[in-house]
Swiss-Prot record:
Extracellular side: 1-27, 86-98, 163-185, 244-259
Gene that this polypeptide is encoded by: Xcr1
Gene Ontology BP annotations: chemotaxis; release of sequestered calcium ion into cytosol; response to cytokine
Organism: Mus musculus
Chain's role: Receptor for chemokines SCYC1 and SCYC2. Subsequently transduces a signal by increasing the intracellular calcium ions level. Receptor for XCL1/Lymphotactin.
The protein's name in its UniProt record: Chemokine XC receptor 1
GO cellular component terms listed in the entry, alphabetical order: plasma membrane
Length: 322
């Protein structure tokens, strides 16, 4: 049987009979990996937020999306310590069981929402720049972000409704609730990826006819972030679908699926620390801002405490920190 903290596992009668030897692997790997991911995500995403607020133009819609994507990753990473502490049993009661899974759903849906909207925005900016002239107002920024978070809360309600504490485990109380949640996640994931794929096909067709290096840089980073998200979450969504029991499985195949589920879940849940790394390696402006920030901090440490020292602001250079 898998760890009690697997969010979307439903142990039917067959899987209950098929006891396996992956509990030790699951527990140890979860504790070690999630502790590391939590620290990396906390540091990395906090640095991204600092760079955005300190050095960048928050009137840019793209930067607002990046900021909210950071908040979503931080929200997810804050769930990991609870996940670690609840490896053997759920100790926080029904309310926090529901709340915990709802926050998980909100961070999951908000991430894919913001990635999809970022791609659509970049598609419009490249393919039809005139159509984006009126969407950079404060009212538009507030409206878009509010709608995304509201929709994320709405989509995550089933995760809260169908979860409860059963035998000291926080899990789905009804099999149909598990099925509905998995189908919703997978359909939403596939639709979003379909929209993103369409947008990038059109973007690439347009960019082949233009030589704007700024546009190429921006598209390249957003594309890298989207690909990283897809590669992280697609295997997890696939194993979730297989766990629904749609495909008839033997005891041996269930054991193999349990191991695959652990590995895919670890990969998916580690995604919250990936984006800051991608920004460093792909985002030229972000890398320059980060270097400037570290130089300022280093100079402040070397300066006498009697001399006031505060990091300055970077000169605004463009619509986003790519």
């Amino acid at each position: 049987m898998e760890s009690s903290t697997a969010f979307y596992d439903y142990h039917d009668k067959l899987s209950l009979l098929c006891e396996n030897n992956v509990i030790f692997f699951s527990t140890i790997s979860t504790i070690v990996l999630y502790s590391l991911v939590f620290l990396l995500s906390l540091v990395g995403n906090s640095l991204v937020l600092w760079v955005l607020v300190k050095y960048e133009n928050l009137e840019s819609l793209t930067n607002i999306f990046i900021l909210n994507l950071c908040l979503s990753d931080l929200m997810f990473s804050c769930l990991l310590p609870v996940l670690i502490s609840a490896q053997w049993s759920w100790f926080l009661g029904d309310f926090f069981c529901k709340f915990f899974n709802m926050i998980f759903g909100i961070s999951l849906y908000s991430s894919i929402f913001f990635l999809t909207i970022m791609t659509i925005h970049r598609y419009l900016s490249v393919v039809s720049p005139i159509s984006t002239l009126g969407i950079h107002t404060l009212r538009c920024r507030v409206l878009v972000t509010s709608c995304v978070w509201a929709a994320s809360i709405l989509f995550s309600i089933p995760d809260a409704v169908f979860h409860k504490v059963i035998s000291l485990n926080c899990k789905y109380s009804e099999h149909h609730g598990f099925l509905a949640s998995v189908y919703q996640h997978n359909i939403f994931f596939l639709l979003s990826m379909g929209i993103i794929l369409f947008c990038y096909v059109q973007i690439l067709r347009t960019l082949f006819r233009t030589r704007s290096r700024q546009r190429h840089r921006t598209v390249r980073l957003i594309f890298t972030v989207v690909v990283a998200y897809f590669l992280s979450w697609a295997p997890y969504n696939l194993t979730l679908f297989l766990k629904t029991g749609i495909i008839q499985q033997s005891c041996e195949s269930l054991q193999q699926l349990d191991i695959a589920m652990i590995i895919c879940r670890h990969l998916a849940f580690s995604h919250c620390c990936f984006n800051p790394v991608l920004y460093v390696f792909v985002g030229i402006k972000f890398r320059r801002h980060l270097k400037h920030l570290f130089q300022q901090v280093w100079l402040c440490r070397k300066t006498s405490s009697t001399v006031p020292c505060s990091p300055g602001t970077f000169t605004y250079e463009g619509p986003s920190f790519y």
